[in-house]
């Protein structure tokens, strides 16, 4: 099951690479990563690059999650992951839900693999980023981490394809 921006910021040609990570390479979640091999972003203002890259670094520091692009919106999920995760419990409303989804999958023990992509900023339209969305992400990550210290996560089911 894929998630991607519909404004072609994510290249549809990369869908097969994300699919291959799950179908052939044993990943449960494949993340189209802007930051796996440096910063691969085209036509974003420097302030947005710094904010996005910094946010991913912050999330990694707070959560310990080994994902370089924690805010990525280009993701392939095996259906079993989404069935297992209790999506009705996702609390974040803004872009931070991207972080919550990856962190929850990670805590359940699902295998996350990043696939390097180049993100090209949209030609038309504007970002929905706001101070409220930014605050939700900053403080929400701390809440996620604190919750994870006091609650257990049901282990991911064993895959039947020996991966």
Question: Which ranges hold each PLM region?
Answer:
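Short, hydrophobic secondary-structure boundary micro-motifs
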Residues: 30, 69-70, 114, 150, ...
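The conserved acidic donor/metal-binding loop of glycosyltransferases
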Residues: 5-9
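Terminal low-complexity segments of carbohydrate-biosynthetic enzymes
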Residues: 13, 24, 80-81, 109, ...
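Catalytic donor-sugar/metal-binding loop of nucleotide-sugar-dependent glycosyltransferases
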Residues: 66, 89-93, 102-119
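Acceptor/aglycone-binding surface of glycosyltransferases and processive sugar-polymer synthases
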Residues: 2, 12-95, 122-139
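DNA-recognition element of transcription regulators
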Residues: 99
